[in-house]
Amino acid sequence: MDPTPRTAILAPGFQETKLVRVFPAGWTEEAARFHPSSIAGRAEQLRLLTERGLELKHAVVAFTYQGQAALSDDDRDLFWESFGVPVFEQHLGAGNELLAMECEAHAGLHVMRDFGASRLDRNSCACGNPAPRFQRRRIDELAEMLA
């Protein structure tokens, strides 16, 4: 994702930059005026935006948190159909620290630290990221392990 797209983060606790704006209250008039090409937030927030006709150009990032289930296939399909851009999942800790992130090959979630778990796929990923990952079908196991 280089260069950084104009991104609206619809959750508190993130750092803003010139191209990344944080909207802790979710989608607001201010967020709409920002005209993001990418949005990031919890699946519940993203679902509320699916009927607004937003024209995104880059990606949707769905946050899941420790103790929560992974992004459902139904939500993934809904976001793809509604926004017309790729959908990526990021699994975050309580302080919004990145624990695992979906790669561009959509081959699963690459973990940011090694848990030594035998369930991690340590084979080369099509995206080129050498970090071990949970394959797409096993992401709920990752959520349980990170909890």
PLM regions: where:
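Active-site glycine/GP-rich loop and adjacent strand/helix microenvironment
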Residues: 1-147
